[in-house]
């Protein structure tokens, strides 16, 4: 099976802002362009699961407008990591000591004081990943962190203990990556 991991279009926030669980809109023109590009490459009748955050739902609905053969479903497990008190702040305004605390306990630290841990994110994304059918291709419209988690899950990695284990190669806004999965890979 093939899984398309699609990242939402650029958001309407200042560059360098932390916006994990923050529900912000994406740029409409970039969303339309991403939907148009994606519509041309997807096979007929795929199930499209989307994060409930508006930047992803915008892309899902734009894609459906071009491809009504697709089956849309919202899946809360595909929402981005909650960065707690960091949400809405500029990344460069967050104290280095906060990053150090996170990397010292990468798996279990509640990011931003009351946000999610990497372990919690991997668990919820793992649940969605485990429900993938071995025979049917699918699409996830989601976020950078969730795409990275799915990449790890596809490699059989269910948990990340250290920051250097987290994938560094990301997917740009409005772009996608495909994973070829065997039925055993998602069990």
Question: Which positions does each model-derived feature cover?
Answer:
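Short, well-ordered beta-to-alpha junction loops that form the rim of enzyme active sites
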Residues: 9, 51-54, 77, 140-145, ...
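Glycine-rich, phosphate-binding/catalytic loops in enzymes
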Residues: 21-23, 64-67, 91, 156-160
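Short amphipathic alpha-helical segments
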Residues: 17-18, 60-62, 151-154
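Loop-to-helix element that buttresses phosphate recognition and phosphoryl-transfer chemistry
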Residues: 2-59, 111-125
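Phosphate-coordination/substrate-recognition cap region in phosphate-metabolizing enzymes
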Residues: 36-99
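Generic beta-sheet signal
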Residues: 3-4, 46, 135-145
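Domain-level recognition of soluble alpha/beta enzyme cores
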Residues: 155-186
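Glycine-centered loop/turn motifs
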Residues: 16, 88, 137, 169-176
């Amino acid at each position: 099976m093939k899984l398309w991991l699609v990242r939402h279009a650029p958001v309407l926030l200042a560059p360098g802002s932390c916006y994990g669980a923050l529900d912000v809109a994406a740029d409409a023109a970039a969303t339309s362009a991403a939907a148009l590009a994606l519509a041309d490459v997807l096979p007929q009748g795929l199930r499209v699961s989307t994060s409930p955050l508006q930047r992803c739902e915008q892309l899902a609905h734009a894609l459906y407008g071009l491809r009504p053969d697709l089956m849309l479903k919202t899946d809360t497990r595909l929402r981005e990591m909650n960065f707690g008190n960091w949400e809405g702040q500029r990344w460069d305004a967050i104290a280095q000591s906060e990053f150090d605390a996170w990397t010292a306990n990468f798996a279990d630290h509640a990011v931003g004081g009351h946000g999610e841990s990497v372990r919690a994110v991997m668990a919820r994304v793992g649940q969605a990943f485990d429900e993938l059918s071995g025979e049917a291709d699918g699409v996830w419209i989601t976020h950078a962190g969730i795409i990275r988690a799915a990449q790890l899950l596809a490699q059989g990695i269910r948990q990340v203990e250290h920051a250097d284990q987290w994938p560094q190669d990301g997917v740009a806004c409005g772009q996608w990556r495909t994973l070829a999965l065997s039925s055993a890979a998602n069990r």
